[in-house]
Each structure stands twice: as C-alpha cells, then as structure tokens.
C-alpha cells in the first residue's frame, strides 16, 4: 500500500474510535476501514471534501451507510468472492463441533491436564450429523458452498432464499427449496445462517421464529450477529427449548453477551471471535481486492467491486 500510495496506516492495528475515524475522513482521499469501523451518516457528513472512495476491507458493508456516502458523492467498494470457501469451512467446523461436543471435550482434557477416566458407552455423547436435515438461510455463494460441504457429510440440504437457485444447482445438491422460512425452521435439525446483514434481515431470526425450531435443533451463524435476536436465542437454549448454537458473530461484537459465555462453559454453545474468514490466503486476497479497487478509482475507472445503495 505504501509503495503505491501516500498511505497512513493504523500501525498497531487498534480498533479506531469514532473521533479517530472522523479525523481520518477529514484528511483522506481514500479510506480503508475494517468491518468493525463504523462509517455512519454522521461520520460521512463530517468527511472532508477530498474523500471520494471508501474501500472496505471486508465483504459485508453493514458498517457503512452506503446511501449517505452516495449522497456525498463517495464511492464504496468491498471485497467479494474471496472469502466464500473460508467462511464455508468455518460454518462446517461449527456445525460439527456443537453436536459432537468437540470444544467441550478439548477443554476437558486441558483442564484435567490430559487425564480422563477412559472410554465408556455414555462418555461425552453428542448427536450424529449424518442423515440430519440442514436448513440454510441465504443460498448465495457462501450458502451454496456450505451446502456442498454438508452434502458430503451426509446431510439433506434444504434452503430458504429470496430467489430460488437454478434447477442445476438444486439437482447437484439434491436441495429442497422452502418458500416459507417459518415452515423450514420447524422441520430442520440444524439451521445455518448465511444471508447478508441488511435492514430487511435485521432479526430475521426473531424470537417468534427461533421458537418454531425443534428442541433438539442447533443454530449456526457465520454471517452477522444482527440477523439473530441474540437474547431470544439465549433464552431458548437456557430453557432447554433449543439444543445449542455455534456462533462466529455476535449482535454487539466485539462485546459478547455474558449469558452466552455462561452457556459456553456448560457446553451448550461454541463461540468464536469472528474468525470465519481468518486465513492467510483470504487476507492476502482481500488486500489485493482493496488495492485493485483503489487503483481503478485513482486511474479514473469504475472500481470492479463498487457497492450500490440499492444492493445493500
């Protein structure tokens, strides 16, 4: 970045507060935020006249008010297509780790310094994955990649999406489309949340909808925390009305609800610090995307990954 541009970097990689972000926006021609940097309408209103591009280091742009940026003549870009496989891998990791109690078992060995009582018929019993019904909420690139992996593990694939996928994809995955999200939730053993975070998907998995799930079912979320009513999810797990959850994202991250931490200690949930895309290869690909978008913009071309307000 420094070789190509007069770049001012967040050297210690700390999470910038709002005054720091606004100060950068007043001086910069191009801003490169991460998904935890909130670029809301108030911040955009205070941007300097030279700021013309916000090149987000991330696929999701729910941290940016894209409409407000457009009104100020500021282009927004993201880094699509490079995180699909990494995020799908993490989804499968959570999908396996919760029913099979993998983290609980690993923690037990660590706490006992490798000592355990030995095998017995009822030792660390979890739930079988093979043959279970997986309901995918959001059958885009990531949802489809999750489905391909899950099919190889013997799960039957079901999905809810704004639009039905092609007959070829349905045939390949032997996938069943559900027009009604409510009806799908009530029939699945595992729900995987893979849709984008938009105003329309805020609390898409509401208290009412989560309550439709079977008490033996699990929820997995590697998309965005705001899509699920987190408090409702916690209450149902606490009450034994839902078997558990695997979460890589949280409604108020980076803060994690203390009640979720308590459930994790009991082995009811597996919690990860939003690391679904955290691979060396993925980060390099994201950085390359950011630079390609900046160079195109600086050279007077339309950036290839421009985000339009009506697409958010």
PLM features: residue spans?
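An N-terminal-biased, well-structured beta-alpha scaffold segment characteristic
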Residues: 1-77, 186, 206, 212
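Conserved beta-strand positions in the Rossmann-like core of class I SAM-dependent methyltransferases
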Residues: 8, 158, 226
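Rossmann-like adenosine-cofactor binding region
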Residues: 39-42, 163-261
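Phosphate-coordination loops involved in phosphoryl transfer and adenosine-cofactor binding
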Residues: 51, 130-133, 207, 216
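Phosphate-binding beta-alpha-beta segment of Rossmann-like dinucleotide-binding domains, i.e.
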Residues: 80-133, 145-148, 159, 167, ...
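Hydrophobic/small residue at the entry helix of a nucleotide-binding pocket
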Residues: 142
